[in-house]
């Protein structure tokens, strides 16, 4: 069932891409379908957001230092 749905989506996008002559979009679509078949797209969302939060905290500290060093006008 899953394979049939993915193939149907692929064919619809293929027809739309050919109609719009957007051939540069097709390689990424084919790569996405192959990785979906192989199951590489399954990732945990929690691990993706943790490094970004650390970066945000570091940037916040850097901004506080920058504002502390700025002269008051």
From Swiss-Prot:
GO cellular component, one term: extracellular region
Compartment annotation: Secreted; Target cell membrane
BP-aspect Gene Ontology terms: defense response to bacterium
Residues recorded as bearing Lysine amide in the entry: 38
Key words of the record: Amidation, Antibiotic, Antimicrobial, Cleavage on pair of basic residues, Membrane, Secreted, Signal, Target cell membrane, Target membrane, Transmembrane
Domain of life per record: Eukaryota
Signal peptide feature range: 1-22
Propeptide: 44-73
Keyword Secreted part of the UniProt annotation: yes
Keyword Signal carried by entry: yes
Major site of localization recorded for this protein: secreted
Tissue-specific expression: Expressed by the venom gland.
Family: Belongs to the non-disulfide-bridged peptide (NDBP) superfamily. Short antimicrobial peptide (group 4) family.
Entry function: Cationic host defense peptide that have antibacterial activity by breaking membranes. Is more effective on Gram-positive than on Gram-negative bacteria.
Entry protein name: Mucroporin-like peptide
Protein's organism: Lychas mucronatus (Chinese swimming scorpion)
């Amino acid at each position: 069932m899953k394979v049939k749905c993915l193939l149907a989506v692929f064919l619809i996008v293929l027809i739309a891409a050919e109609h719009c002559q957007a051939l540069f979009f097709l390689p990424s679509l084919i790569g996405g379908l192959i990785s979906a078949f192989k199951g590489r797209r399954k990732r945990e969302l929690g691990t993706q957001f943790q490094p970004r939060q650390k970066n945000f905290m570091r940037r916040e500290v850097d901004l506080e230092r920058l504002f502390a060093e700025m002269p008051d006008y």
